Amino acid sequence: MIIIGIDEAGRGPVLGPMVVCAFAIEKEREEELKKLGVKDSKELTKNKRAYLKKLLENLGYVEKRILEAEEINQLMNSINLNDIEINAFSKVAKNLIEKLNIRDDEIEIYIDACSTNTKKFEDSFKDKIEDIIKERNLNIKIIAEHKADAKYPVVSAASIIAKAERDEIIDYYKKIYGDIGSGYPSDPKTIKFLEDYFKKHKKLPDIARTHWKTCKRILDKSKQTKLIIE
């Protein structure tokens, strides 16, 4: 039986993408993940995550979805972040099931739930994959929990790959934009980068999530200044 873990990295930052990853492995091989020292990606160093990512990609089956800031900005005009995440989670799950050509079988899917209502999150996710369940005659057990990345090795694996992938993207951004900080809205370096960029270019960078309060504050401040000048 195949087990799948799904998690994301970069849900909260004001800069950069959200990376969603589904990781699958045969249930009887789950012990191999524990032997690798797989755990919550936030407890691992950046170098350790990068090292484990390579090992995990060779050990199991991986499907990723990278939602750049521009796509998140566009999607948030019509749906909220939870819906964006559920859509991405269901997409990687379905892609992985198709890639592995799983039919007439049992699957367990473990998810790190973003919503405060884990049951609602679980039901929404199941609705999104209902078509592939029927089409392929699958018996699927879904476990959606908070901090699943700290409880289930298969989710930890997905978390590590997603986080390491995002680390690489942020490093690339730093080569282009300079010191952008951590990308989190509470980071003074990130706030300064956004303010300085806006001051110089009269717009926010493409890597900024415009629906976040940090960006809205900069845009609102600019509008108020313009009104005062006029």
Swiss-Prot record:
EC number assigned by the record: 3.1.26.4
Entry GO terms, CC: cytoplasm; ribonuclease H2 complex
Domain of life per record: Archaea
Catalytic function, reaction form: Endonucleolytic cleavage to 5'-phosphomonoester
Domain RNase H type-2 as annotated: residue spans: 1-224
Cofactor, how bound (note): Manganese or magnesium. Binds 1 divalent metal ion per monomer in the absence of substrate. May bind a second metal ion after substrate binding.
GO molecular function: manganese ion binding; RNA binding; RNA-DNA hybrid ribonuclease activity
BP GO terms, sorted: DNA replication, removal of RNA primer; mismatch repair
PROSITE patterns referenced in this protein's UniProt entry, alphabetically: RNASE_H_2 (PS51975)
Cell compartments where the protein resides: Cytoplasm
Binding residues annotated for a divalent metal cation, in chain numbering: 7-8, 112
Cofactor(s) of this protein: Mn(2+); Mg(2+)
Keywords of the record: Cytoplasm, Endonuclease, Hydrolase, Magnesium, Manganese, Metal-binding, Nuclease
Family from the record: Belongs to the RNase HII family.
Record function comment: Endonuclease that specifically degrades the RNA of RNA-DNA hybrids.
Entry protein name: Ribonuclease HII
Species per Swiss-Prot/TrEMBL record: Methanocaldococcus jannaschii (strain ATCC 43067 / DSM 2661 / JAL-1 / JCM 10045 / NBRC 100440) (Methanococcus jannaschii)
